[in-house]
Structures are given as structure tokens and as C-alpha cells.
Regions:
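N-terminal periplasmic/intermembrane-space "pro-region" immediately following the signal or transit peptide
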Residues: 17-94, 361, 365-376, 406-408, ...
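Outer-membrane beta-barrel pore domains
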Residues: 103-104, 142, 153-155, 256-258, ...
Length: 466
């Protein structure tokens, strides 16, 4: 403003001088000198104005290149101005309560089910990475699995239909297993998840085809027993192949079948080691293979030793506030019984299935992915979050070949059938409270600690995730 005013005054003076006739040589010289100074002043003003323009342009360029920092329900995000580099700090905590009804021998308890800090981001636009750890008390740690490190991988997005992921991550098998841990319908996943592999180390090719209507994944992994996770495989040179194809045939239509998803997955490989036991939704073990020194019949020891394959047809359907999810898993494993003398071998086929339904009373659109409440919880503004009702039924059946040589029929059940109901209160996208009732009937195992009676348990959870 001051520069513009100086220019205006100088222009007026110059105009006045030019309009006054010269009265003499001296006066003419003075006028010429004054006009010269005014011209110099105008030049200086122009230089200053250009300098200000350049400074403004530089400031705009600096602002354009400056990284962007944001905080919200998606976590703490640091992003370069061109979005080619992104760093996100996220995490979640789940605090659970387990309360057993009737004459159960299990103890009621509170526990930290999951405590998971997450670091993820993008490098050079196409290379995504993720590191997730877990410090909860329920983390399983073995000689081949650092239970603290759950995810540690890089995903190269060369094209939507051609992506290469390597590191430690979930094998592409179980439908509910692949669902995010902070987006579960029930406190604990269903029986099929216990037969599907969890996280494994390997490399996987995956992507979306045909306008996003088909997702595929195929990979090579170390291989893990049912429900297990591994970092490395020191004793088994064989690797597993895992594959999955999942289709949304009506995704790009406006029909009521738009939310239908159908798929099949499976694994094939060879495993060795101690086979896993199986537990109820209340985390009571109801089946275990015999375990001993392996020197005689009384101390028989069972080991996985040979071919393993899995097959899992799966589907879900969402329409408005309604959701339905179902899956079936067959897991076949060759086992060896050591009890002195020649080992006894057998191929086992264990199966599990579940069907789970959900409905949002508050009208939100249901989804396999996390749902955003229409109105976050805020009583002052008549906001009460989203209320979701859930129900499921499922079964796990153990191969009859296991009894009595490979498992004790008195203490281990031959199968378990369960049903449950529950409610999820989504206060907002980051906070959720869950309450479940689960009933489980056990077949066999009449003298087992967990299987001598049916299990009735109330499970509760408060979750914070960002």
C-alpha cells in the first residue's frame, strides 16, 4: 500500500511539472533533476514490487511442497505434498471380560485381548509397507513364531491386477480370518478360523480384475499348522502353496445382489511338528492329540508328518442394514503316532463351518469392512452411535479316525456345536463395545475338564482403534 501511494504521488508531481512551462534555465534544470529522481523512484518501486511477487511465489511453492500432517479416526498421518510418501501411526486396544455360567471349571477373568501399535505407509507412490506388533497377554510365542510381530510386509502395487506382497502376513484362506481384527461380529472368531492358517512368511501375487469384480491371490509360504503362525521354518524344507479367488459378480450393478461375494480358497503342502489343539469360543480346550515320550502305548506321542491340504468355499451377502457371512473349511493332515515299535500313520480330515448374520437397527449400510455410524455418540446432539445385532451358528467336527489311538475319547470331544447371539455398539468409527452369549455342546469327552458339561459363557469387549 505504501509503495502504491508513493508511485501515485510521484506520478502527480511529474504530471504537474510537465504541465508547467519552463521560466528559465535554472528552473528547467531543477525540473529535469526532479523528473530524473522521480523516474529512479519509479524504477525502485517496480523492483520492490517484483521482489514481493517473487517472495510470494516462493512462499506458495514452499507451501505446495511442504508435507501435510493430519490427525483423525484414521490415525496420525504424515504425507508428502505429492502424496508419493505417506507415514501412518495407528493402533488399537481390546479389553475383554469372560464370565462362565453354570458349573464350569473355568475362571471368570478380565484380560487384554489385543494391544497393537501399527506403523504403515507408502514409499515412492507404489510401495506400501505395514508393521504391526501385539503386546497383549494372550499372544502366543513359539520357537518358530515371534508372537509379538504379527505383520511385517511390503506390497508393491505395480497395477491393480498385478501386486506383489512379501514378508509376514495373513495367508489368503479363511474368510473371517481375513476380516480385520477390529471389525469382527463376535468377540472371538468362529470354528472355521481354527482350521485355516493364520499369518505366515512368504511371497504372494494378488490383485483385482474385471473392474474390481474378481480378486485373486496365490502365494508360496513356509507353511503352518491349523490356526498357526510362523516367522521361519527351520525343520521342514517343503513349502505351502495358498490360493484364493473371490468374486463380486454384481458389484457394478444396482440390483439387490450387488453385495454378494462368492469365493473359494485352499492350501497344499507338507507339515511336520506338534499338531494344534482346538478350543471353544470361551477359550476352553476341548480337543488335544496325545502327547508323551512316545516310548509305549501309555506315553504315545502324535506328530504332524506329511501331506496337508485345505479347502474353503466361502460367501457373504450385504443389503442395506442386513449382512450374512458363511464359510466351510476342510483341513486334511497326515499324522504319525510314536508309541514304541513301528510308527502308525493316518490321514485326518477335520471340518468346520459357520453362518453368521447381523443387522443394524440404526439403519447403517452393512459391510464386510468397518461401518461408519450415521451419527456418532453424542447425547447432547441426540447422537447415539450405531447398534448392531448379531447371531451365529457353527460346528467343528474331528475325524473319527483320531480315536482312540491318536486322541483320548474320554478327555477330548469328537466335535463341538455352538450358537451365539450378541450386540455391537459402535459409538463412532474408533470406539466399539461388544456383548455376546455363546452356548457350546460337546460330543464325547465325558471326563474332560472342559467337555464334561456344556459351555455357557458371556463375553464382553471394549475396543478403541484409530
Amino acid at each position: 500500500m505504501r509503495i502504491q501511494r508513493s508511485v501515485a504521488i510521484a506520478a502527480l508531481i511529474a504530471a504537474s511539472l510537465k504541465s508547467v512551462p519552463a521560466s528559465g534555465g535554472a528552473d528547467s534544470g531543477v525540473a529535469s533533476e526532479l523528473l530524473k529522481r522521480i523516474d529512479e523512484l519509479e524504477q525502485k518501486v517496480k523492483v520492490l514490487e517484483r521482489k514481493r511477487e517473487l517472495e510470494g511465489e516462493a512462499a506458495e511453492e514452499t507451501a505446495r511442497k511442504a508435507p501435510v500432517v493430519s490427525i483423525g479416526s484414521g490415525g496420525f498421518t504424515f504425507r508428502s505434498a505429492d502424496t508419493n510418501f505417506v507415514l501412518k501411526l495407528r493402533g488399537g486396544v481390546q479389553t475383554d471380560g469372560r464370565f462362565y455360567l453354570g458349573n464350569s471349571s473355568a475362571n471368570d477373568s478380565f484380560l487384554l485381548r489385543r494391544v497393537r501399535p501399527i506403523v504403515e505407509g507408502t514409499l515412492f507412490e507404489k510401495y506400501d509397507f505395514r508393521i504391526m506388533t501385539d503386546f497383549a497377554s494372550g499372544v502366543t510365542q513359539t520357537t518358530v513364531n515371534n508372537g509379538t510381530i504379527l505383520d511385517a510386509y511390503v506390497n508393491a502395487r505395480f497395477a491393480p491386477g498385478f501386486q506383489l506382497q512379501f514378508g509376514k502376513f495373513k495367508e489368503p484362506v479363511g474368510l473371517e480370518r481375513l476380516q480385520s481384527w477390529y471389525n469382527l461380529l463376535f468377540v472371538e472368531r468362529g470354528f472355521p478360523t481354527q482350521l485355516a492358517p493364520n499369518r505366515d512368511t512368504g511371497v504372494m501375487l494378488h490383485g483385482e480384475l474385471f473392474s474390481g469384480t474378481v480378486n485373486y491371490a496365490v502365494g508360496a509360504f513356509n507353511g503352518t499348522l491349523d490356526g498357526g503362525s510362523t516367522d521361519f521354518d527351520a525343520s521342514d524344507p517343503d513349502k505351502d502353496v495358498a490360493a484364493r479367488v473371490f468374486s463380486h459378480p454384481f458389484k457394478n450393478t444396482g440390483t439387490l445382489w450387488k453385495g454378494l461375494g462368492l469365493g473359494v480358497s485352499g492350501t497344499y503342502g507338507s507339515h511336520s511338528g506338534t499338531p494344534r489343539s482346538y478350543a471353544s469360543h470361551g477359550s476352553q480346550r476341548f480337543f488335544a492329540y496325545r502327547s508323551g515320550a512316545g516310548t509305549n502305548a501309555a506315553t504315545a506321542n502324535i506328530l504332524a508328518d506329511g501331506t496337508n491340504w485345505r479347502l474353503s468355499p466361502q460367501a457373504y451377502y450385504y443389503w442395506g442394514p442386513f449382512g450374512l457371512l458363511g464359510e466351510y473349511v476342510i483341513s486334511s493332515q497326515e499324522l504319525r503316532r510314536d508309541a514304541g515299535g513301528a510308527p502308525v500313520r493316518a490321514q485326518f480330515k477335520n471340518t468346520a463351518w459357520q453362518v453368521a448374520a447381523s443387522y443394524f437397527l440404526t439403519g447403517e449400510d452393512n459391510s464386510y469392512k468397518p461401518v461408519q455410524p450415521r451419527r456418532n455418540f453424542n447425547p447432547a446432539n441426540s447422537g447415539w452411535g450405531a447398534l448392531e445385532l448379531t447371531a451365529r451358528v457353527g460346528e467343528l467336527d474331528l475325524d473319527d479316525v483320531a480315536f482312540p489311538l491318536f486322541a483320548n475319547p474320554a478327555t477330548s470331544a469328537t466335535g463341538a456345536f455352538s450358537w451365539g447371539v450378541g450386540a455391537n455398539w459402535h459409538l463412532n468409527r474408533s470406539v466399539k463395545a461388544t456383548l455376546n452369549f455363546e452356548h457350546t455342546d460337546f460330543k464325547g469327552g465325558s471326563t474332560g475338564v472342559a467337555t464334561a458339561q456344556d459351555e455357557n459363557v458371556i463375553l464382553g469387549r471394549v475396543q478403541v482403534f484409530f
